[in-house]
Swiss-Prot record:
Keywords: Amino-acid biosynthesis, Cobalt, Diaminopimelate biosynthesis, Hydrolase, Lysine biosynthesis, Metal-binding, Zinc. It catalyses: N-succinyl-(2S,6S)-2,6-diaminopimelate + H2O = (2S,6S)-2,6-diaminopimelate + succinate. One of its GO terms (molecular function) is acetylornithine deacetylase activity. This is Succinyl-diaminopimelate desuccinylase. Catalyzes the hydrolysis of N-succinyl-L,L-diaminopimelic acid (SDAP), forming succinate and LL-2,6-diaminopimelate (DAP), an intermediate involved in the bacterial biosynthesis of lysine and meso-diaminopimelic acid, an essential component of bacterial cell walls. Its cofactor is Zn(2+); Co(2+). One of its GO terms (biological process) is L-arginine biosynthetic process. PANTHER family: ACETYLORNITHINE DEACETYLASE, N-ACETYL-L-CITRULLINE DEACETYLASE. Pfam families: M20_dimer, Peptidase_M20. Zn(2+) 1 binds at residues 74, 107, 170. Its EC number is 3.5.1.18.
Length: 391
């Protein structure tokens, strides 16, 4: 059994459902300490939702110019769902047909294990590197995300810590490890629209005000804008901005009562061609044009970010090609990740991890061979970035 697989199984066996780290960071910290890393645990959150974060850093000796590479990830996992629906216990690492099964097998305990072992092997071959190496781990990525990576990033920014490169171990591959990496992500912004009406008997509509009827034309216009790609056209790196309704609540459940209010939840996934302010302005303009009596609350989950081809992207692409022969695809598709927080303090951020087909599912799994492939890609990236410093 490879050292990467062994460590991955150790981590998978820990039931670290958000926000519980379940000792994962202690296992990793002990290995990093032996490599000369300085460890800092940053806890955050209320007593009933205590989050554990780890910042581990190894700085080179001497005064030669250095650059900092951070491996970022999370030790928490999503809930298992009904355990009885799993073929094997979700927190008992199990091998079947060349695959490793368990919660976190893809998202993202194998990535974290590959991070650590790649560093161990890199330092064994290059004991005094010019690179500053760091790991940022949290137990609050799969949850609200307010006491995890963002807390560490804010602390690093406050102390003036410089981060040049960051690799986030999110599962990004589609069919084979390395076939896709994320060099950016769309922004996310949610709205909660409360439409005010007057409740009444359905037989006496003149004595009531139906909020569903009132908002329907405005929603139809917003849907039409979205269907026509009318928010923006996107660009070479980003798909056009998308708007979707996620929930619509109205009524008492009775069939003879006009509801007194309606609540609609919606979300934008937006490109760099739009801003939160521009999208908010357009939505409000539509609502105002239809005379909708409403209250609208906005939540910005993250701004779009993009790492254009440069030192980090080139190093990762070359590492993937050397290890797998794949010409990797750069993408900004999909949901959000903690990379949105890191991008505020680091200009070059990419996400690179295993195949994502089974993440968050019953019987989550990864091809065993892919684990070593990922570790080797990380190590080759380290080697290339180190070589760029000494040229």
């Amino acid at each position: 059994m490879s050292r990467t697989l062994q460590l991955a199984e150790q981590l998978i066996s820990r039931p670290s459902v958000t926000p519980d780290d379940a000792g994962c960071q202690q296992i990793l910290g002990e290995r990093l300490a032996r490599l000369g890393f300085t460890l800092e645990t940053i806890e955050s959150g209320p007593a009933d939702f205590r989050v554990t974060n780890l910042w581990a850093v190894r700085r080179p000796a001497g005064t030669a110019p250095t650059k900092t590479l951070v491996f970022a990830g999370h030790t928490d996992v999503v809930p298992t769902g009904p355990v009885e629906q799993w073929t094997s216990h979700p927190f008992t690492p199990t091998h079947r047909g060349g695959k490793l099964y368990g919660r976190g097998a893809c998202d993202m305990k194998t990535s974290v294990a590959a991070f650590v072992v790649s560093i161990e092997e890199f330092l064994a071959a290059t004991p005094d590197p010019r690179l500053t190496l760091a790991l940022l781990l949290t137990s609050d990525e799969e949850g609200p995300g307010v006491d995890g990576t963002v807390i560490v990033c804010n602390a690093l920014a406050a102390r003036g810590e410089t981060i040049d490169y960051c690799i986030v171990g999110e599962p990004t591959a589609v069919e084979r490890c390395g076939d896709m990496i994320k060099n950016g992500r769309r922004g996310t912004m949610s709205g909660k629209l409360t439409v005010h009406g007057v409740q009444g008997h359905i037989a006496y509509p003149h004595l009531a005000k139906n909020p569903v009827h009132a908002v329907a034309p405005a929603l139809a216009e917003l849907v039409a804008i979205n269907a026509a790609g009318g928010w923006d056209a996107g660009n070479a790196y980003f798909q056009p901005t998308s708007w979707q309704i996620s929930n619509f609540h109205a009524g008492t459940g009775a069939s003879n009562v006009i509801p007194g209010s309606a609540v609609i939840d919606f979300n934008f996934r937006f490109s760099t061609e739009s801003t939160p302010e521009s999208l908010q302005k357009r939505v409000h303009a539509v609502l105002d044009a239809h005379g909708v009596d409403c209250t609208l609350a906005w939540t910005i989950g993250g701004l779009p970010f993009l790492t254009t081809p440069g030192e980090l992207v080139s190093a990762v692409q070359a590492a993937i090609a050397d290890e797998t022969g794949i010409a990797t695809e750069l993408s900004t598709s999909g949901g959000t990740s903690d990379a949105r927080f890191i991008a505020k303090i680091c200009k070059q951020v990419v996400e690179l991890g295993p195949v994502n087909a089974s993440i968050h599912k019953i019987d989550e799994h990864i091809d065993v061979a892919e684990i070593e492939t990922l570790k080797n890609i990380y190590k080759r990236t380290l080697e290339r970035l180190e070589a760029s410093l000494i040229q």
